[in-house]
Amino acid sequence: MIQQESQLKVADNTGAKKVKCFKVLGGSRRRYATVGDVIVCSVRDIEPDSSVKKGDVVKAVIVRTRNDIHRKDGSTLRFDTNSCVIIDDKGNPKGTRIFGPVAREIRDRGFVKISSLAPEVI
């Protein structure tokens, strides 16, 4: 579960390394976000020559969480890190590559471009 003040790793090649969530989109009092949810976050740590700058406010979709993901068939899924992919206003990823596996729920939520760029969909 991702909430306000949560720090996440960035799983794409935009140049941002870490972001900090400050709003979960999808309701006036929504507290937690999980895989496939969109959050508004601030860039906290960057690589040199990146397309985003430190302090930029960006939208991101969560692709991995340390909290369990419960599926309808009874199986559960858990990742090692909390990670996200930075997106634009239309929902397309800003980067051209995605690092690491992503959950299948990403495709179910309508982020087909992210799931097709990912090396593995679990």
UniProtKB/Swiss-Prot annotation:
Entry-linked InterPro entries: Ribosomal_uL14, Ribosomal_uL14_bac-type, Ribosomal_uL14_CS, Ribosomal_uL14_sf
Superkingdom in the source lineage: Bacteria
Keyword field contains RNA-binding: yes
GO biological process, one term: translation
Biological role: Binds to 23S rRNA. Forms part of two intersubunit bridges in the 70S ribosome.
Description of how the protein assembles with itself and partners: Part of the 50S ribosomal subunit. Forms a cluster with proteins L3 and L19. In the 70S ribosome, L14 and L19 interact and together make contacts with the 16S rRNA in bridges B5 and B8.
Family: Belongs to the universal ribosomal protein uL14 family.
Cited NCBIfam families: rplN_bact
HAMAP family assigned to the protein according to its UniProt record, in alphabetical order: Ribosomal_uL14
Protein name stated in the entry: Large ribosomal subunit protein uL14
